[in-house]
């Protein structure tokens, strides 16, 4: 399937499985009359494959060691991309950032690293399923930077176009999205 056909098919899957209208309170605290819940798309076999494919293609020219983001939205996405990257002979390892470190066990804030493995000096991409203001992704960026990593890109599947671009620019973070909310609202 061509890139444009993959993108169109994924948009259809998102529209049918993950987009809705109706009043909702977003993670940012804002109210909205539409929403995206990408988990049904990320956990669908075809949706996961297409998200991984298009995300991997968006990262192809970046030199990336790790990909991850804040739990829960980044977990299935980072895992799918890591798997595809292995199959493409260009492995990108995955991790996720806990919203709050576990209070037991190793008490980790960043999960997915092997014993003794570190993000220090590594080039990382932060992924997010849906971005509104950028606040959740910036929390992940802060945790990953604290571990010594370099953030090369913040990549979201759907940008709601409600301030994230400006927030990332202000924070000096490159930002890209696979889709804009307006692509779904104007159809």
Curated annotation (Swiss-Prot):
It comes from Rhodopseudomonas palustris (strain BisB5). It comes from the Bacteria. It catalyses: orotidine 5'-phosphate + diphosphate = orotate + 5-phospho-alpha-D-ribose 1-diphosphate. Orotate binds at residues 132, 160. One of its GO terms (biological process) is pyrimidine nucleobase biosynthetic process. Signal peptide: none annotated. Its cofactor is Mg(2+). Belongs to the purine/pyrimidine phosphoribosyltransferase family. PyrE subfamily. Its EC number is 2.4.2.10. One of its GO terms (molecular function) is magnesium ion binding. Homodimer. The lineage of its organism: Bacteria, Pseudomonadati, Pseudomonadota, Alphaproteobacteria, Hyphomicrobiales. This is Orotate phosphoribosyltransferase. 5-phospho-alpha-D-ribose 1-diphosphate binds at residues 98-99, 102, 104, 128-136. InterPro entries: OPRT, Or_phspho_trans_dom, PRibTrfase_dom, PRTase-like. Catalyzes the transfer of a ribosyl phosphate group from 5-phosphoribose 1-diphosphate to orotate, leading to the formation of orotidine monophosphate (OMP). Keywords: Glycosyltransferase, Magnesium, Pyrimidine biosynthesis, Transferase. NCBIfam families: pyrE. Pathway: Pyrimidine metabolism; UMP biosynthesis via de novo pathway; UMP from orotate: step 1/2. Pfam families: Pribosyltran.
